[in-house]
From Swiss-Prot:
Keywords: Allosteric enzyme, Cytoplasm, Hydrolase, Metal-binding, Protease, Sodium, Threonine protease. The active site is at 5. GO terms for cellular component: HslUV protease complex; proteasome core complex. The keyword Protease applies. SUPFAM superfamilies: N-terminal nucleophile aminohydrolases (Ntn hydrolases). A double ring-shaped homohexamer of HslV is capped on each side by a ring-shaped HslU homohexamer. The assembly of the HslU/HslV complex is dependent on binding of ATP. It catalyses: ATP-dependent cleavage of peptide bonds with broad specificity. Its EC number is 3.4.25.2. It is found in: Cytoplasm. It comes from Thermoanaerobacter sp. (strain X514). This is ATP-dependent protease subunit HslV.
């Protein structure tokens, strides 16, 4: 079983950044890859997704989400709700172990493994093994510094990588 990842989304003003670490872990004690890319731009670069969980499952869900974005003209919320409904109804999709964070210029959404779509109260959301560490760090930085979203996301992941053994500091950041 592949596990471990940290993904963080940070929104501030008109900017939103999504960052992820690069580590893929197999079992409890084997690092298979240090430089994996877990952040993707979709729908002509207007949407950014970050995924955590089983690698194959996360890629499958990311692909399904991209199809829904195309089907619904880039409407992030509609695509997320439609994906969640399909996720809950489909016997194969229900077994997938993954989480997605999806952002566009207006919205930040968490699409959960139970087929739920959650719009966070805060301008920061984290998922994966180091998600809570990164989220706490990002919230502190977001409200107490003048750093921009890219710097907050990167610094939050650096902090999480010092705490979570399933998170490394090989960080990818995408910004809208």
């Amino acid at each position: 079983m592949f596990k471990g990842t940290t993904i963080i989304a940070v929104r501030k003003g008109a900017k939103v950044s999504v960052a992820g670490d690069g580590q893929i872990t197999f079992g409890e004690n084997t690092i298979l890859k240090h430089g994996a890319k877990k952040i993707r731009r979709l729908y002509n670069g207007e949407v950014i997704v970050g995924f955590a969980g089983s690698v194959a499952d996360a890629l499958t869900l990311s692909q399904k989400f991209e199809e829904k974005l195309e089907q619904y003209g880039g409407n992030l919320k509609r695509a997320a709700v439609e994906l969640a409904q399909e996720w809950r109804k489909d016997k194969i999709l229900r077994k997938l172990e993954a989480l997605l964070i999806a952002v566009d210029k207006k919205d930040t959404l968490l699409i959960s493994g139970t087929g739920e779509v959650i719009e966070p109260d805060e301008d920061v959301i984290g998922i994966g093994s180091g998600g809570n560490y990164a989220m706490a760090a990002a919230l502190a930085l977001r409200y107490n510094t003048d750093l921009d979203t890219e710097d907050i996301a990167k610094k939050a992941l650096e902090i999480a990588s010092k705490i979570c053994v399933y998170t490394n500091n090989n960080i990818t950041v995408e910004t809208l």
